[in-house]
Amino acid sequence: MLSGKDLGRAIEQAINKKIASGSVKSKAEVARHFKVQPPSIYDWIKKGSISKDKLPELWRFFSDVVGPEHWGLNEYPIPTPTNSDTKSELLDINNLYQAASDEIRAIVAFLLSGNATEPDWVDHDVRAYIAAMEMKVGKYLKALESERKSQNITKTGT
């Protein structure tokens, strides 16, 4: 992992690439995304220091324009939750993501961005398909929740 001035340069380069890609318009917009004031972004660049808790979001936010090697990493670290089941699930998801094609990764990045940035390949068909998927998954999850609740109902009283 880069640190100091090298990290500052890497942050500045990533911001410039993000602006050049058209997904953000300014450093101020980047600051808003990270819920910090614009001077903080300038400090990140100048001093190369950023709060460790912001690193995963930094990597995620710029993942459409730079990879882990840009930050001096071989791969992005996997979050380590306390629950071992969740950890195993995250490892599985990460392995699937790493094995996915560039096209699948681009789709995942777009979906996880919350439609904050819209690549050129996104058109009304893609938006309609995503809306339909979200609606179907919503119905599916509600049905699962309803089924789970009905199985947990126990008879009480006399």
Swiss-Prot record:
Keywords carried by this UniProt record: DNA-binding, Repressor, Transcription, Transcription regulation
GO molecular function per UniProt: DNA binding; DNA-binding transcription repressor activity
Keyword hit for Electron transport: no
Disruption phenotype: Deletion of the gene is lethal, except when the adjacent ydaS gene and the common intergenic region between racR and ydaS are also deleted, or when both ydaS and ydaT genes are also deleted. Down-regulation of the gene leads to up-regulation of the adjacent ydaS-ydaT operon. RacR silencing causes striking morphological changes in cells, significant growth arrest and cell death. RacR silencing does not affect biofilm formation.
Gene Ontology terms: biological process: negative regulation of DNA-templated transcription initiation
Record comment regarding domains: Contains a DNA-binding N-terminal domain (NTD) and a C-terminal domain that facilitates oligomerization.
Miscellaneous remark of the record: Encoded in the Rac prophage region.
Stated name of the protein: DNA-binding transcriptional repressor RacR
